[in-house]
Each structure stands twice: as structure tokens, then as C-alpha cells.
Amino acid sequence: MAEKILVVGGGGREHAIIKALKKSPDCGEIWCAPGNGGISYDAKCKNIKATDVDTMVGFAVEEKFDYVVVAQDDPLALGMVDALAKVGIPAFGPDKAAARIEASKVFSKDLMKKYGIPTAKYETFDDPAKVMDYIRAEGKYPVVIKADGLALGKGVLICENEQQAADGVKEIMLDKKFGASGNHVVVEEFLTGPEVSVLSFTDGKVVKPMVSSMDHKRANDHDTGLNTGGMGTIAPNPYYTPEVAAECMEKIFLPTIRAMNAEGCPFKGCLYFGLMLTPDGPKVIEYNCRFGDPETQVVLPLLESDLLHIMQACTNGTLAEQEVKFSDGAAACVILASGGYPVAYEKGKPISGLVDGQLPGEENVTVYHSGTAITEDGQLVTNGGRVLGVTATGPRLTNALSHAYEAAEKISFEKLHKRSDIGLRALKALAEKQ
């Protein structure tokens, strides 16, 4: 029977989830809250803040949704899945206790230390003076300072010297740039090596990893500029070999699920492993308790299995029996951002080149909407820092990348900013392998 589904969130990740869910024969009416302009071409949108748990749950009850996908980190940390369970609505995503794996860096680092999961050496602090005493005593730069709580992916500072570290501590702990998220900080050693993102499905018992991906966090080419939510992605990640995958499953993925069970907070949903392949082997840089953005925009287009069935198997504890299959191809996503992102940027710029939110006549290309709105007279306009993600799939990474960039050239808005080097590091790695 066709199911009525609500997706909570309003960015490119949610758009990718909706497009993948719609391929399921069991997916009926689909809604997104709050959604955005571009998502409204694919789903009915209801303007409720993702963090307004009570209103969202009330809406879910009123509209009699069969299943809710909580795609954003904030509502998960606020316990939206718990609140839905209380009114008898099944949901995809971890409960509040399990969502701490992302919502608190201190919780996740202490978890890894306790259960022997490889990660960077670290200390946690709630006193700014003690942070600087520790950093001076260690005397090693660069050093990484992380806000404990959620900070839209921007709460991590890499400090090259004592002055930068002092400025970073002031920004997070004294100026409260991220509010209460900066009451505690984690200070950790700087790791080197290729980064890999691995999203995984889990029902708290088994882990089924998705195809690996590589994010590009910095705003500008050659990995310069400020950290962003992500300026583009590719999948699969060439550094993530079958040997590395086997080691990660044995030393990181399964131990993490077992650790959460042992702590009395089993994790169900999408667990994202941010990894670094160091000279000492793979180590965890971060966990996210939900799909990554823009990793989702390259991972889900390669999924061949039924996403709705997989999600429900995670909720029901039946993932072991559920097929999770990805195509052998590749995908690349190029983010089109507003000029000035991730700091100050303007909104409301008309977007040209799209028809009903997509590029007409383009095969194997999908445009995912991160920050768009539709004006009263029907004009699609920019409405965020990251505006669109142009994803192309192909048999190989070279095809996917060239196609994504060709397609991106057909879209324009005032002060559009994109990186021109998405995937270049991955292509070099592939060339070295051959």
C-alpha cells in the first residue's frame, strides 16, 4: 500500500532523499517541511521550522503520515524521533540519546576512547584558560579546536599558531559564536591523510555502508578559504579501497554500533563516518547522526535498492534481510553558492537556465535545491548560501565530473560562486593507482 511520507528539513540533502524515495513503488504522497522552492516541484511543502518539534509532530498526526524521515541534525538532537514514537508514528533517524553521537563532540570522543575506536588524541575543556595552558604545554601546531555542540559544520577551527588558537578559544568559548554549543570544547591533534565520508544504514544491529564519497569543505579552489557546509562531492572515493573498507568495518563501524548499544542508546538510522586515512590507519574525525550534505547528492543517485524499504528496515530492526545495492558507476556534485558564502551573502537573485527546477534535455543530471524560493510571480530565486547542487552520474568519475561542470555552466544568477576543482584530487589518486 502506498505510504504517506513526511521528510523533515529543507535543503539539498532533503531534495535528494525525496527524489530517491519517489522511486519506491510504495511511496505515495510525499511532503517536506519546511522544504524550499525547488523541493516544491517534487513534494508538497509545509512551512514549519525543522526545530519546532511540537508543531511538526502535531502536523504529522493531523495529516496522518505513515512514516517520517527526520533528515536534519537539530530536530534529531531535540528528540523529534522520540516525540513521534510517543504518538505512534514510525520515523527514520536516531532518538535523542543516540543523536548525542553528533550533538556532543565530548560524548563521541569519550565513547571512542572508552571502546578503543581509533581517533585523534584529544582533551576536553570547559575553562578557556585551561585550553590555552594545554595547547602551550603540548606545543604542537596545527592544533584542532572543536565546539562541543552543533554548529552547522562550522564549529571546527584548525589553528596554525598560538595566536590563532587564542582567537579561536575566544570566539567559541567567550564570544559564544555558536551559543551554548561552545560551553565545552575538544582540543585534538591534527591528523593528515586523505579524507573519506562513509554514510551507513544501521538498525542498531548490523551496518550496511553506502558507497564512499569525498567532500570539498573549503570555499575556494585548492582547498583555500573558509570552511563551508561543503562545495561539492564525488563518489566513490578512490582512496577507500576494499582493504580499507574491511578494516573500517572491523575497527570502526561495528565497534561504534556495539559501543552505542553498550551505553544503552542503540543507534538506528543513517550514521555518517567522517574518516581520515592516516599513516597509522583509518581514524574517525567525526560522526554525524544523519545523511551528509552534499554527500547525499552523490550517494543516493547511485543507490539501486528501494530507499523506503531500507529506511523502514532500519526502523524495524530487519536490515540484515534488506538488500542495499549501489551501481558501479560514479557521481559528482558541484555546488552553486551565493557570492560571499559562507559569510555575508545576498538573497533573492533570479535564477536562469532551469525549467521546473531542472535542466531541460539533460540526461543523467539532477539539480538538487539547497537554498531556493519561488516568488509570488513564479520566479525561482536564490534564498541561501548554498543555492543548488548539480549532480551528474556516469560510468567513471571523469565522465561524471565533466558532465556536472558542463551542466552547471547552463545555470546562472548574480554573483554565483563555484569551485572549479571538485574531484581533481580524486582523479589524481585514480591516475596514480593505474
Predicted features by range, described:
Residues 6-7, 102-184, 214, 238-254:
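Active-site nucleotide/adenylate-binding loops and adjacent lid/helix of ATP-dependent enzymes
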Residues 249-271, 288-362, 375:
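Active-site "cap" helix and flanking loop/linker of ATP-utilizing ligase/carboxylase catalytic domains
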Residues 372-377, 381-434:
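Generic C-terminus detector
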